[in-house]
UniProtKB/Swiss-Prot annotation:
Homodimer. It comes from Shewanella piezotolerans (strain WP3 / JCM 13877). SUPFAM superfamilies: PLP-dependent transferases. The lineage of its organism: Bacteria, Pseudomonadati, Pseudomonadota, Gammaproteobacteria, Alteromonadales. This is Serine hydroxymethyltransferase. Pathway: One-carbon metabolism; tetrahydrofolate interconversion; Amino-acid biosynthesis; glycine biosynthesis; glycine from L-serine: step 1/1. Its cofactor is pyridoxal 5'-phosphate. It is found in: Cytoplasm. One of its GO terms (cellular component) is cytosol. Signal peptide: none annotated. Keywords: Amino-acid biosynthesis, Cytoplasm, One-carbon metabolism, Pyridoxal phosphate, Transferase.
Length: 418
């Protein structure tokens, strides 16, 4: 018999302790992983509802199970809000993740073995953009473009040259570690030149796009995907969008999600997406995203002032790459040193990195989470100087302990959930 007063703490103290420890870590550590953020209590509430009990294979009004009249409303709310948020005429809110959303696009628009042109993982792309270890590189003929080493920006001339040479059926624009502004229109121009679909993965900048401070790819791309966490600050999940008014493609996309790649949707997560989309439509969300960019720019500028190399020389969005090659330091060691001071980052390859992806020569740094907990430009500069203090000599334990104490004090002033 199920009872409302059942809880994890009493039944499974070992698991509860791990959850409590992670909660404490999030409050006492500064989060700078560019793909992480803090969801609102409303999003967390939605994910903890009884919607998790409901199977709802199919789409609103066309389910394979009975009893879906209420979850239909939930999904329709999420769909309509996603369309409004991004100016789309089509939205599929069912993908469990960004990678699964991307896989659905491949399945809908391509045949196995077709040629795709995407950004190299080593230059800031994503696994699903054609990496040889991903389905996108195993099942398809993947050609990769990169950035111009002299500018740190996407080399559009190379993109066009490769497109003309290889005649891809689909060109992929988007990134997981690129600090510039992507020219979606230029990508569409190249795609049209060779008769290719343009598929944009805006997972990292979706929140900035929603706020109108990063170019919207919807007017240019045939299909757009995103995650619903990262800068959108919603639950972990995926989303597929389009604005081309092509019902045939919309039908293919729906079929590629269900039954092509997934079974029943996660209705509790879709409810959380609906909440997050509503939050993103609020005016204060734009203010938040503007501060995200201000903070990232301030951090990149401060690193440069302290003698560190920033790929592309700065940032125009929420993230940037710190190149540590000139410091003779690995990303792995830098990551660990900052972690010891309660500052969480992730090691990351830099363009033409001589080290393996398990070691790397760089760090990826993002501002969405620190901005979410209330950091402004002043705190961002202060934090960056602390990070430089640690990185100037990662063997100096006294500096590490001093910075850790400063981090704890700052975190106490800016609780995640105050």
């Amino acid at each position: 018999m199920l009872k409302k007063d059942m809880n994890i703490a009493d039944y499974d103290p070992q698991l509860f302790a791990a959850i409590e420890d992670e909660t404490r870590r999030q409050e006492e550590h500064i989060e700078l992983i560019a793909s992480e953020n803090y969801t609102s209590p409303r999003v967390i509430e939605a994910q903890g509802t009884q919607l998790t009990n409901k199977y709802a294979e199919g789409y609103p009004g066309k389910r394979y199970y009975g009893g879906c009249e209420h979850v239909d409303i939930v999904e329709e709310l999420a769909i309509s809000r996603a369309k409004e948020l991004f100016g789309a005429t089509y939205a599929n809110v069912q993908p469990h993740s960004g990678s699964q959303a991307n896989a659905a696009v491949f399945m809908a628009l391509l045949e196995g073995g077709d040629t795709v042109l995407g950004m190299s993982l080593a230059h800031g792309g994503h696994l699903t953009h054609g990496s040889h270890v991903s389905f996108s590189g195993k099942l398809y003929n993947a050609v990769q473009y990169g950035i111009d080493e002299s500018t740190g920006k996407i080399d559009y001339a190379e993109v066009e040259r490769l497109a003309v040479e290889h005649k891809p059926k689909m060109i992929i624009a988007g990134f997981s570690a690129y600090s510039g502004i992507v020219d979606w229109g230029k990508f569409r121009e190249i795609a049209d030149k060779v008769g290719a679909y343009l598929f944009v993965d805006m997972a990292h900048v979706a929140g900035l796009v929603a706020a109108g401070i990063y170019p919207n790819p919807l007017p240019h791309a045939h299909v757009v995907t995103t995650t619903t966490h990262k800068t959108l600050a919603g639950p972990r999940g995926g989303l597929i969008l389009s604005a081309i008014d092509d019902e045939a493609i919309y039908k293919k996309l729906n079929s590629a999600v269900f039954p092509g790649g997934q079974g029943g949707p996660l209705m509790h997560v879709i409810a959380a997406k609906a909440v997050a989309f509503k939050e993103a439509l609020d005016p204060e969300f734009t203010t938040y995203q503007e501060q995200v960019v201000v903070n990232a720019k301030a951090m990149a500028r401060t690193f440069i002032e302290r003698g560190y190399d920033v790929v592309s020389g700065g940032t125009d969005n929420h993230l940037f790459l710190l190149d540590l090659i000139s410091k003779d330091m690995t990303g792995k060691d830098a990551d660990a040193a900052l972690g010891n001071a309660n500052i969480t980052v992730n090691k990351n390859s830099v363009p033409n990195d001589p080290r393996s992806p398990f070691v790397t020569s760089g760090l990826r740094i993002g501002s969405p989470a620190i901005t979410r907990r209330g950091f402004g430009e002043q705190e961002s500069v202060l934090l960056t100087n602390w990070m430089c203090d640690v990185l100037d000599d990662i063997s100096d334990l006294a500096v590490s302990e001093r910075v850790k104490a400063q981090v704890l004090e700052l975190c106490a002033k800016f609780p995640v959930y105050g």
